[in-house]
Amino acid sequence: MRLVVLTAVAAALAICADAPKADLTLQDGAGKKVRLRDLRGKPLVLNFWATWCGPCKAEMPMLVELEKQYGARGVQFIGASMDEAKTRAQIPTFLAEHHVAFPVWYGASADDLDRLHLGGAVPATAFLDAEGHIVARILGQARPEELKERLDWLTGDRSGPAPDPLVKHLQ
């Protein structure tokens, strides 16, 4: 039994090592190009959201609180706004109202969600390891325990079983 478990863990690690690294190029609030690959070296939470999205509004306070807790443990949080030109002006107000202190990138699209296998709707959250591999995804509004379980695993020694790599709250 122990050999089976060790073999399964080794296979999962080998697959992860061969998996392509996630990449995304957007703009920061000042219009400067920003790239996901430039943040490799520490675990990262990438949350796709929009100002017009009700579940995103409900989820954002959780992310803000978790960033305070896990940012101190080396986890980088990035918000990727799906707002288009007509709603983009609302982003600074949204960020101020929700006390968002982590970086927010502008110009995310449905193509970005698709390329990262995050479905076709927001909110959507990807958890990346320090090498840039997506190790977990939550499609739809995340629950606090789902976020914490993945963050604890990502920042821990990973000796226990990994959390479910996909949580899907959307149909």
What are these regions, as identified by a protein language model?
Residues L3-D23, T93, G160-Q171:
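N-proximal helix/coil linker or "cap" segments that precede and/or mark the start of modular domains
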Residues A14-D38, F102:
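N-terminal "domain-start" segment that seeds a small globular fold
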Residues K42-L44, F48-W52, A121, E131:
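Short pre-active-site segment immediately N-terminal to redox-active cysteine/selenocysteine motifs
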Residues F48-E65:
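Conserved redox-active cysteine motifs that mediate thiol-disulfide chemistry
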Residues G74-R88, V100-S109:
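Thiol-based oxidoreductase modules, predominantly thioredoxin-like and allied folds used
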Residues P92-L128:
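Short, internal strand/loop/helix patches
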Residues A124-Q171:
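Thiol-/selenol-based redox modules, centered on thioredoxin-like
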